[in-house]
Amino acid sequence: MEKYTTRGRKILLFCFPLACGLIGLAVVAGEPLLDSLYRCIGMYLLDYGDTPPNLWVEVARWTAPLATASWVVLAFGALRRVLCGWLRYLRADSVAVYGQGPAVALLLDQLGNRGVAGGQSLLPAHRYILVGPEEKNLSFYREHQRELADKPVYLQSHSLSPLASNHPLLKFFCPEANAARLFWQKRGLYQISCRKKHQLQIVLLGFGRLGEELLLRGLQVNIFAPDQCIQYHIFGGGERFEAIHTGIARIEDPVVFHREPWYTRLDLVDQADLLLVLEQEDQPHLLEDLLLATTRQTVDVFAGGALAITPLEQDPRLHIFPWEQRAYTPEILLDDLLLARAKAINLRYSHLYGKVAETAENRETEWARLDPFTRESNISAADYHQVRLEMLAALGLPASAQALPGQTLELLAELEHIRWCRYHYLHNWVWGQPEDGKRKDPVRRIHADLVPYGQLTEAEKEKDRENIRILLSVE
C-alpha cells in the first residue's frame, strides 16, 4: 500500500505544472484546450518563450522543467539500480535485501559485492532476505510468491517460527534466535564444563524472547557428557514460557524459573559459572547494581544501543555482545554449511532406509519432502556438530569417522541421542508406543525411542552412530 501511495505522490507532483498551465491558458486566458495542452507539454521540454499571460502560467513555466529534471534523475537512479542488480545477479551467490531499518544497510555492507539493494521492485537474485516489520515482509512475499517460488527466502518474523513454513525454501527467522545461536558458538562452554567436571550453573538476568531463544538453543548445544548437570537459573519472568514448554521438565539439566528478585540470591549470582545480562529496561542501572553487589569479574552483557553511550561499555568486567548487530551477520543468517550438513543427514537416512540414491538432485528432492518439524530436527543435529568438532579438537582426536576410536564414537552417539531427545522434549513430545506398531505418532507427539541411550536397540543406536559418521564426512 505504501508503495502505491508514494508512486501516486510522484505522479501528482509531475502533473502539477500541467494542471497549472491548463488553468492559466485554457481557463483564465481562454485559449483552445488542445493548444493549451500542446503548449503545456512544451514547458516540460523548455519550449515556452512567450510572456506568461498570468500567474498560473508563470508557475507552470518554472516548475515544469524541474519536474522533468527530477524524473530524469529518478529514471537514471532506477536504471542504475536495475543494471547493478543484474550485474550482481551474474554472481552465483547474489543476495537481495528488502525491508526497512538499519538492518538493511548492515546486511548490504557485510554482503559486499554480492548484495543487491531491493528497493520497491523485485530485482533478480539467487537468494532474498526480507527484514523489518513482519506484516510488510509477508505482504511483499505474497505479492511476489510466484517469482520467489524457486528461490531461498529468509523472512524476518517475530510471531512465526521456522516450523510455520511448509515451503522448504521459505525460512522464518527472528534476530533473537540468530543471536542466541551465534553466542553459544562463540562462547564455547566445553572447556569450562570440563574444568568443572560438567557441573555448571548458568544465570540469566532478564528473559523475554531473547532469553527464550538462549535457553532453547543452550539446552540443545551445551551437551558435553551423559552425566552432566548444567543448571539454568532464570530471573525476570518466564511464567508463560514455563507453562507452555512442559517438556523441559523431562530434560536432565534443571531449568529453574525464579520468582524472587535476583538481588535476593546474590550467592547464586556471584558464584555462577556464567552470568548473562539480557537487554532490558534500565539495563545500565542494573549493571551498576550488579557490579556493586558482587565481586564477579566476568559478566556477559547482551547490549543494545542504550548501553553503548554509557561509560559501562569500557568496564573490563563486562563482555559486551552487541546482539542486534550480530544477529544480521550473513554467515549466521544464511549459513550454507549448516544447511549442507542437515541435508546430508537426511539424504543418508533416505539412502539407508528408503534405498534413495545419494545424488545432488535427490538431496534437494528429499529435503523438500520433509515436514517442518523433521527439517528443523536435522538442522538442530547439524548445529550441534560444531560442538562435537570442538570436543574432538580438545581431546586431540581427528575429525574423521575412520580414525575415531570406538569408545569415542559411542560417547558421541550417546550425546547425539540426548540432543535428539531434548529437541523432542522442547516440542512437548513424550515417550509412548503407537498402536500401529510404528516408532512414532506425530499427532499424539509420542515416540518409542525417547528413552536413555542404554535402552535403545542396537539398530537405533546405529542410527546415532551413522549420524556422527555422516557429519564428519561433510566439509
Where are the predicted features?
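Cytosolic regulatory regions of ion transport systems
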Residues: 1-35, 42, 46-414
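Membrane-interacting alpha-helical segments
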Residues: 337-345, 425-427, 431-434
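Short loop/beta submotifs within extracellular cysteine-rich repeat domains
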Residues: 374, 388-389, 420-428, 458-462
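Short, solvent-exposed interaction modules
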Residues: 406, 411, 415-430
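Surface-exposed intrinsically disordered loops and tails
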Residues: 431-448
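Amphipathic alpha-helical binding modules
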Residues: 443-474
